[in-house]
């Protein structure tokens, strides 16, 4: 039994040719017999399937005398040498290419983990790592790295032609050392990028137009509000001026009525001097004959001047009134009260209505047309 085991080990360490392995196939009984011998000689604690070489009929010592003779002449080797024996068998396998690894990886992943663990011992750790790497990286396609010159030429062509015909695409691909598919894909991506850029610009322009319209509307509304506010201020100012004017007239009439009864020729308190009053004072120096009459006229005219009245527009200039005499003043007083000349020494009785009429007649004089 030991002799057979030694001859078996010697055959395992030997290197049979590939033709012998392929031409001679054992019967089913021999295969099971050799596997049972191998498993009986090994330790019964671990059940290891027979290696790939034991499935070949050359395990029988009497089948090939040349192999048995070679096995008898080789030195004995330890069982540790049988563990490293699959390495030369792996060297006989054809080289593996990346596309072959991808297919193998797909098949290996389909197998359950238990079957993979009980597989032949010739698959080492390195091979499993290579299969894992090939399965992980083979599914992803690498991006094309274009050079600066290629990108420049492609951008130039895209500037003139957004779409390429096939002859031009083939020409550019040959010129730039690219494939036709790469040129086609680049133009597709560039067209999509151009479309996104134009859409973004249109959106920005539309938003800017809406903002400008809103700003213009706000400005117009502000201007309208300002104009309305100014109009309201002007109207309120005009109303205040009219109220102040009527209040001054009423105050003057109330002060002049008792002074007329007392016969006093006192001056009345008037608002600050205007340009018309200054002209009246200058006019007093030219006609010193009637100082009292002109002073009363100036004060009354300054107090009740209203250039907007229709009487003021119809009155001629004051060139005809450069010289006033006492007779004219007396005539005016006679028109107001016929009993005034006869009762000069007595207090004059002038009603409020007659005084208002007197002030209205004086306001008709247009003092702005005075010519000096």
Curated annotation (Swiss-Prot):
Keyword Transcription among record annotations: yes
One Gene Ontology cellular component: nucleus
Membrane-spanning residues: none
DNA-binding region per Swiss-Prot/TrEMBL record: 139-198
SMART domains: HOX
Subcellular location: Nucleus
Gene3D superfamilies: Homeodomain-like
Single GO MF annotation: DNA-binding transcription factor activity
UniProt region (Disordered), positions on chain: 42-96, 194-225
Keyword Nucleus: yes
Protein family membership: Belongs to the Antp homeobox family. Proboscipedia subfamily.
Function: Sequence-specific transcription factor which is part of a developmental regulatory system that provides cells with specific positional identities on the anterior-posterior axis.
Protein name (record): Homeobox protein Hox-A2
Species per Swiss-Prot/TrEMBL record: Rattus norvegicus
């Amino acid at each position: 039994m030991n002799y057979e085991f030694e001859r078996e080990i010697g055959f395992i360490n030997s290197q049979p040719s590939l033709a012998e392995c392929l031409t001679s196939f054992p019967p089913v009984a021999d295969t099971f017999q050799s596997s049972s011998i191998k498993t009986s000689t090994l330790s019964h604690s671990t059940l290891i399937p027979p290696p790939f070489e034991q499935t070949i009929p050359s395990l029988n010592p009497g089948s090939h005398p040349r192999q048995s003779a070679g096995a008898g002449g080789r030195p004995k080797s330890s069982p540790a040498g049988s563990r490293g024996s699959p390495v030369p068998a792996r060297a006989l396998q054809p080289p593996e290419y990346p596309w072959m690894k991808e297919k193998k990886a797909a098949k290996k992943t389909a197998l359950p983990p238990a079957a993979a663990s009980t597989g032949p011992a010739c698959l080492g750790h390195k091979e499993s790592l290579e299969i894992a790497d090939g399965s992980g990286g083979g599914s992803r396609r690498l991006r094309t790295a274009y050079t600066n010159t290629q990108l420049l030429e492609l951008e130039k062509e895209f500037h003139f032609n957004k779409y390429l015909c096939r002859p031009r695409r083939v020409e550019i691909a040959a010129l730039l050392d690219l494939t036709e598919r790469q040129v086609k894909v680049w133009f597709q991506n560039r067209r999509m990028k151009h479309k996104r850029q134009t859409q973004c610009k249109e959106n920005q322009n539309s938003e800017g137009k809406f903002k400008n319209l809103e700003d213009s509307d706000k400005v117009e509304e502000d201007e309208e509000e300002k104009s309305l506010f100014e109009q309201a201020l002007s109207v309120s100012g005009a109303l205040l001026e009219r109220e102040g004017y009527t209040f001054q007239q009423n105050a003057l009439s109330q002060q002049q009525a008792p002074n007329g009864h007392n016969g006093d020729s006192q001056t009345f308190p008037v608002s600050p001097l205007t340009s018309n009053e200054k002209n009246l004072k200058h006019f007093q120096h030219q006609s010193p004959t009637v100082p009292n009459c002109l002073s009363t006229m100036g004060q009354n005219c300054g107090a009740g001047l209203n250039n907007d009245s229709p009487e003021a527009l119809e009155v001629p200039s004051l060139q005809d009134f450069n010289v006033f005499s006492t007779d004219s003043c007396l005539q005016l007083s006679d028109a107001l009260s016929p009993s005034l000349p006869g009762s000069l020494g007595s207090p004059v009785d002038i009603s409020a209505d007659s005084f208002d009429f007197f002030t209205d007649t004086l306001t008709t004089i247009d003092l702005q047309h005075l010519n000096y």
